[in-house]
């Protein structure tokens, strides 16, 4: 599984960046993830200075993101070309979708409204609207201020109970009761959708995303709108019928 994720991520990034350098592309804006920043650490606050600990036994996804991004920076830094690089590191991306594919972040929200997650989990996640992510890429491409920068995109961090509260306030059925870490781990043995989230139970981490505002001028879409637009997309693609 690790090879399936890591090798394509690193080699794909290497091919694209190498070709861009060969063609003397003026600037590259690379989509990475906060997963390249925070995995494998015990601390709770992160900035663009941090990197996931790829030498530790971390999951394949954050390892692939960190190694792919490191490869891009390595190629740029060793090149004698004038090509500039900006890396965008989004938190959990939500909002309106163009396809029926569901990400791990979206899976939590869909589980809360379709009943597959019957109780609020002790999960604390950073969220950002897909429209803000798209805008950040455009602004990064146009701005020389972003040259050579990693930029975290995270509107806010919410516990699952906070997401459920927003859903209920907007007329959706969502859990009212919250599970402790112990109960959540126990339930994850019987509810498959919970297993991928086990490593996040009870961990509250925050990311400093001031660069997005200071360098790119990003003004985040209201998080409630992002969540509701996400749910409307899930409904449109038949992920639930509520």
Question: Model regions: which residues?
Answer:
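Conserved Rossmann-fold NAD(P)-dependent oxidoreductase catalytic core, especially the SDR/UDP-sugar
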Residues: 2-61
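Active-site beta-alpha turn of Rossmann-fold NAD(P)-dependent dehydrogenases/reductases
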Residues: 29-32, 89-91, 154
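Glycine/proline-rich active-site loop of Rossmann-fold NAD(P)-dependent oxidoreductases
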Residues: 81-83, 95-108, 140-151
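Conserved loop-to-helix N-cap of the C-terminal "lid" that shapes the substrate pocket in Rossmann-like
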Residues: 87, 124-134, 150, 220, ...
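Mid/C-terminal beta-alpha module of Rossmann-like enzyme folds, strongest
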Residues: 136-195, 223, 227-242
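Conserved C-terminal active-site "lid" loop/helix of NAD(P)H-dependent oxidoreductases
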Residues: 188-219
């Amino acid at each position: 599984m690790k090879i399936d994720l890591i090798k394509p991520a690193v080699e794909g990034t290497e091919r694209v960046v190498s070709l861009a350098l060969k063609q003397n592309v003026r600037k590259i804006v690379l989509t990475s993830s906060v997963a390249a920043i925070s995995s494998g650490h015990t601390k709770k606050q992160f900035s663009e200075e941090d990197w996931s600990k790829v030498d530790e036994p971390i999951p394949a996804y954050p390892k692939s993101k960190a190694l792919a991004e490191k490869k891009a920076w390595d190629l740029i830094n060793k090149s004698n070309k004038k090509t500039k690089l900006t890396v965008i590191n989004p938190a959990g991306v939500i909002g309106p979708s163009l396809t029926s594919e569901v990400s791990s972040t979206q899976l939590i929200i869909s589980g809360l409204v379709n009943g597959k997650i019957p109780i609020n989990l002790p999960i604390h996640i950073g969220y950002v609207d897909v429209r803000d992510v798209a805008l950040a890429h455009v602004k990064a491409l146009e701005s020389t201020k972003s040259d050579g920068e990693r930029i975290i995109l995270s509107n806010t961090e919410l516990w699952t109970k906070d997401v459920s509260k927003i859903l209920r306030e907007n007329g959706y059925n969502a859990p009212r009761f919250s599970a402790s870490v112990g109960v959540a781990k126990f339930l994850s043995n019987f509810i498959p959708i919970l297993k991928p989230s086990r490593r996040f139970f009870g961990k509250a981490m925050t990311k400093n995303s001031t660069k997005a505002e200071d360098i790119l001028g990003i003004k985040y879409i209201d998080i409630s709108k992002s969540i509701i637009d996400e749910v409307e997309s899930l409904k449109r693609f038949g992920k639930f019928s509520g």
